[in-house]
Regions:
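Canonical Rossmann dinucleotide-binding motif of NAD(H)/NADP(H)-dependent dehydrogenases/reductases
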Residues: 1-37
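Conserved NAD(P)H cofactor-binding loop of Rossmann-fold oxidoreductase domains
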Residues: 93-99
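Substrate-binding pocket helix/loop in short-chain dehydrogenase/reductase
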Residues: 101-114
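Active-site helix of classical SDR
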Residues: 125, 161
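C-terminal helical subdomain
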Residues: 185, 204-242
């Protein structure tokens, strides 16, 4: 229920990567549930627009923090900006997702993925999760990906960082059972977001499950928090991935997913 969610995970939610895509949708839906919001992103003007939109549609207080999660000191900025704010819900959604063959990507790009996709979520969970644990209530949503469960050509490093988020969240789900703090890893398949469109996939060549939409993906994530350690949004995606993992040897699974990526991103 609306009130139940607010009393369990309020009064403030912090969402990273909130300036577009899934992060924006999280901001909208969490705002609609009556929680105040701290929205974090590197893109200042887009972030300001999202904040304004959510203030208008939900009437909740919205605070924005512009920072780069690949910076070693990003937490100092966040700590300063959230002083005196009780964050009861953390949505670790920001990610750096370049697509390309491993040896065609710069080392700098690959290391940045680890900074934004692994190091930053770890620090955020360590920081905000500890205070939730002390208060005996709260929620943590970590965005993983359908790519986290097997090797995926063209996003080798990215998929590996998403596996880190999946395993971290599932482990914390178990460690924190009964503590009042809920943890969930969300594993969406390809989702129709600006970020995905910017990767320029040749969608017309592909035969796999249809693209997810951000709205139902986020709604499912908010609904499943506290019910399960990890979740694949979208019934068709869930069935496809679960069945394929049960029926196919790992080698075949990697090749199947890889052939789809080659259709999308191959020359």
């Amino acid at each position: 229920s609306f009130q139940g969610f607010k009393s369990k995970y309020g009064p403030w939610a912090l969402v990273t990567g909130a300036a577009w895509g899934m992060g924006t949708e999280f901001a909208r839906q969490i705002g609609a549930l009556g929680l105040k919001l701290v929205l974090v992103d590197i893109k200042a003007s887009e972030l300001a627009q999202v904040a304004e939109e959510v203030r208008k549609s939900s009437g909740v207080e919205v605070k924005t923090v512009v920072t780069d999660l690949s910076r070693l000191d990003f937490m100092e900025t966040l700590r300063r900006e959230t002083e005196g704010i009780e964050v009861g819900l953390l949505v670790s959604n920001a990610a750096y997702p370049p697509v390309g063959l491993f040896f065609e990507q710069s080392l700098e790009d690959k290391l940045r993925m680890i900074e934004v996709n692994c190091r930053a979520p770890l620090i955020l969970v360590h920081e905000f999760g500890a205070t939730m644990l002390a208060r005996k209530r709260g929620g943590i949503i970590m965005m993983s990906s359908g790519s986290a469960t097997q090797g995926v050509a063209y996003v080798a490093s990215y998929a590996a960082t998403k596996a880190y988020n999946l395993i971290l969240a599932e482990s914390l789900w178990d460690e924190l059972r009964g503590s009042g703090v809920d943890v969930l890893a969300v594993m969406p398949g390809a989702t129709r977001t600006t970020g995905f469109e910017l990767s320029k996939p040749h969608l017309e060549r592909s035969t796999l499950a249809p693209l997810n939409e951000p709205k139902p993906t986020v709604a499912e994530a908010l609904k499943m928090l506290g019910r399960t350690p990890s979740w694949i949004p979208g019934r068709r995606n869930r069935w496809t991935l679960t069945l394929a993992q049960r029926l196919l040897p790992r080698k075949q699974m990697i090749k199947l997913v890889g052939s789809n990526m080659r259709q999308w991103y191959g020359k």
